[in-house]
Amino acid sequence: MLDTQYSQYIQHRIDQKTKPLGALGLLEKVAHQLALIQSQGKETAVEHIELNKPRIIIFAGDHGIADEGVSIAPSAVTQQMVLNFLSGGAAINCFCAVNNVEITVVDTGILLPVESDSDMLISQRLGTRTNNFANEAAMSLETVERGIELGTELVSRTISNGTNIIMFGEMGIGNTSSASAILSALANRTADECVGLGTGINNEQLARKVAVVKQGIARCINPDAKEVLSQVGGYEIVQMVGGFLGAYENRTPVLVDGFIVSVAAYVATLIEPSCRDYMIFAHRSEESGHKILLELLDAEPLLDLGLRLGEGTGAALAMPIIRAAAEFYNNMASFASAGVTV
């Protein structure tokens, strides 16, 4: 849990800027959260928010549930998109380039491994792909534990290399089915409420997707977060859960992307509730389950652009807002310094 001893001072500093109280809306909340995070363990509150080496980690993994026809694309597309990330051709590459965000791509277990000597690629494979959770557990509990550990360690290394704001993205054909099943099982919501169109499936595919999610969650008798990950999770989701826990352990904010990343964020809060304090929600996804997650996490997203791509695109697009929040906190004049009387 965040130490709030400097909260009042930080809010006073924001309120004394040359503007009406609250006039910068969500920017003020973001600035307050960032300043409070960066004041943890310090003798005084920070006067200057630092944003160093922002980085997005894209976790890629394949899903056995893809065999059930729950996506418009085959599993081979996961590998193809990883190659696209590495060559700089994806949407996330464009948005990171324009916003000065570095990219790491993690193979958590894709069907067709990528042969590349790119510095962007890290292999943390938990398997070839998950099992088909319509019929059996997606992975063992031991694999869940190992995946969380790998995600935590990767984020800790990233932070030790100078990054102090981090984002997660994901890629994996079938992963909206996994995320929907996790949400349904842990939040006690129906599959119909949690399942969305994903990559743009038709009504027949949507009905099939709901049916297989119901099959998977029928085995989720134990509401324990790790048990649910074992039954219906994905390798990339498990490692993102670990990533959120790693950011919490290192007192580092995470700019949270859309539906699938938010599912991982939710699971992380069930394991360690205090990690919620380090999350800033980038955008509101078009996926139906994301509204449920934002309510569960009491989150007010920065953007609402109708996005449903994934990859971390919403987080990268929100980075200029984060920079603007830091800039006004750091450099906007106070009434006293500007000689403005009100």
From Swiss-Prot:
SUPFAM superfamilies linked: Nicotinate mononucleotide:5,6-dimethylbenzimidazole phosphoribosyltransferase (CobT)
Pathway the protein contributes to: Nucleoside biosynthesis; alpha-ribazole biosynthesis; alpha-ribazole from 5,6-dimethylbenzimidazole: step 1/2
Function of the protein: Catalyzes the synthesis of alpha-ribazole-5'-phosphate from nicotinate mononucleotide (NAMN) and 5,6-dimethylbenzimidazole (DMB).
Q: Which GO terms describe its biological process?
A: cobalamin biosynthetic process
InterPro entries, sorted? Nict_dMeBzImd_PRibTrfase, Nict_dMeBzImd_PRibTrfase_bact, Nict_dMeBzImd_PRibTrfase_N, Nict_dMeBzImd_PRibTrfase_sf
Task: Tell me yes or no: is Glycosyltransferase among this UniProt entry's keywords.
Answer: yes
Active site feature:
311
Cite a single Pfam family from the UniProt record. DBI_PRT
Gene3D superfamilies assigned to the protein according to its UniProt record, in alphabetical order: 1.10.1610.10, 3.40.50.10210
Species whose genome carries this gene = Vibrio atlanticus (strain LGP32)
Family statement drawn from the similarity comment of this UniProt entry = Belongs to the CobT family.
Q: Which GO terms describe its molecular function?
A: nicotinate-nucleotide-dimethylbenzimidazole phosphoribosyltransferase activity
How would you classify this enzyme at the top EC level? transferase
Task: Please give the catalytic activity noted in the UniProt record.
Answer: 5,6-dimethylbenzimidazole + nicotinate beta-D-ribonucleotide = alpha-ribazole 5'-phosphate + nicotinate + H(+)
- Which NCBIfam families does the record cross-reference, listed alphabetically? cobT_DBIPRT, PRK00105.1
User: Is Glycosyltransferase one of the keywords UniProt gives this record?
Assistant: yes
EC numbers for this chain: 2.4.2.21
Which UniProt keyword terms apply here?
Answer: Cobalamin biosynthesis, Glycosyltransferase, Transferase
Listed name of the protein: Nicotinate-nucleotide--dimethylbenzimidazole phosphoribosyltransferase
